[in-house]
Amino acid sequence: MGKIFIIDVTNRDGVQTARLGLSKLEKTLINIYLDEMGIFQSEFGFPTTKHERGYVEANLELAKMGVIKNLRLEGWIRAIVADVDLAFRRAPSLKHLNLSISTSEQMINGKFQGRKVFKDIIEDMTIAVNAAYAKGAETVGVNAEDASRTSIVNLIEFGKAAKEVGATRLRYCDTLGYDNPFTIYETARTLAEKVGMPIEIHCHGDLGMAIGNSLAGAKGVIDGGQDVYVNTTVNGIGERAGNADLVAFLLAILKSKGFGEKYQLGHEVDLSKAWKIARFASYAFDVEIPINQPGVGRNCFAHASGIHADGVIKDSQNYELYGYEELGRGEALMVETGREICAGQYSGISGFRHVMGNMSVELPEDKDEANKILELVRYANVEAHKPLVEDELIFIAKYPEISRRLLTLTPLMND
């Protein structure tokens, strides 16, 4: 029976959300946290985008060093040969790609304005997949953008063409959140059965159904006899009304009535890391976690009603489906109310040594070497426009050369 694999797209779909964004260091921490959590793959960036170059190379280097241990790092590009060539010119060690192209009649007509028809879409995709493998890619996913508004006949043709040239999986993109759990189940199952390859499910929340659709889509693919790869973002942050939330989707798999008995993850996930990554993403994006967010919202384990409070005190399972400890919650958050020394863009070496010492991190005794780390911290503060968290400071101290690459943005660098 097929399994469920998580491909988190926070560092692609999440960061392209209007009015939001992450620094390259913050994106790197997200990858590290996803790896710690046991997530299968991160769509970690745009290898053709010039300002992503240092970040992409640095994260691939972290994977090579074993800092990122098991998480696959996959780049997103358009399904055109020019993008494939540019991606591998800028990131020669890239091994995993997703190639995206519009498949619906609406988008083909609306975007290309008569310059392309559906057969051109298939031709562009197949040529791009072949080019990616020729450049050294190990896995290539093919994205059918606006799949939920594409006819099933065309989707099957598109998927079979992708399979014929060796694509690893077909991404079914409910780009506008148009599907519902009933329609996506039937479509996903049909694609799995008729195309005969793993299907990736990518859902948006425009109608409030990203989690339900992801769950139903996963069920459909597995019932159709294939592995399923489900896209998530941390805290559901994504374009317009967002994507399927990572933690909520995991809870739906693991905790909903009867689902996990038959439909299981293909990789071990450490749910106790959920609170850590959700809280960091909230701080990094500067978007507060909704008070009622499943698993990580402030009210998720809060009780005021007399009947509920009495019941949960007697036995938490009376009114809680799962324990807060399972998500890594429960620690007391300490907030300094007295004197505090901070590390910022204008910090000096004395104060910086004090800050790092409080985290049990010893800086080099050599003043010049210590100042090099301090300078990186200053630049990181400038880029983030807010104080760095402890893990960011520790990362910079531990990996100064990688940090330098993350912080180096050169608009006019040669390809």
UniProtKB/Swiss-Prot annotation:
Domain of life: Bacteria
Keyword Cell inner membrane: no
Catalytic function, reaction form: oxaloacetate + acetyl-CoA + H2O = citrate + CoA + H(+)
Gene3D superfamilies cross-referenced by the UniProt entry: 1.10.238.260, Aldolase class I (3.20.20.70)
MF terms in GO: citrate (Re)-synthase activity
EC number: 2.3.3.3
Keywords of the record: Cobalt, Magnesium, Manganese, Transferase
Domain Pyruvate carboxyltransferase: 4-275
Cofactor requirements of the protein: Mn(2+)
UniProt-recorded name of the protein: Citrate (Re)-synthase
The organism of origin for this protein: Dehalococcoides mccartyi (strain CBDB1)
